[in-house]
């Protein structure tokens, strides 16, 4: 036998008869205040205009309601939520790998790549990899990462200074706000 879940009244939007306050402040369709009325009086005004009485703020004293078309109001709220989600950007961590013996042109390519990532609002993890006995030259790798940090100064700031991680040395740069 299927179970029918009953929606709690709190989850439902407070419109028309669902507004349960002794007195409410009512705003007309054009934004002018009609004053403090009982929900029954306000509902009667809304029905005369063939519109709904929508609770905007129950935190105010007295609660604020507006006479409007609820379908239109709901659509606008959903549209605003969609726009907000669209504008949200999660900062990813993009990695730029190189060796400490990198040639000048290759280095410039990596800097341009990191610059593009920072402009897009992503963090950049600059990694210098070591092979075999190259790990003895960690000071050169640190100098390279510091040089990269100064080259990217206008676009980002060092979030984590150069440090060794196993056979790599890495540094984290976050975009400037």
From Swiss-Prot:
One of its GO terms (biological process) is ribosome disassembly. Gene3D superfamilies: Translation initiation factor 3 (IF-3), C-terminal domain, Translation initiation factor 3 (IF-3), N-terminal domain. InterPro entries: T_IF-3_C_sf, T_IF-3_N_sf, Translation_initiation_fac3_CS, Translation_initiation_fac_3, Translation_initiation_fac_3_C, Translation_initiation_fac_3_N. The keyword Nucleus does not apply. One of its GO terms (molecular function) is ribosome binding. GO terms for cellular component: cytosol; membrane. Keywords: Cytoplasm, Initiation factor, Protein biosynthesis. Its main location: cytoplasm. NCBIfam families: infC (TIGR00168). Belongs to the IF-3 family. Monomer. This is Translation initiation factor IF-3. It comes from Nostoc sp. (strain PCC 7120 / SAG 25.82 / UTEX 2576).
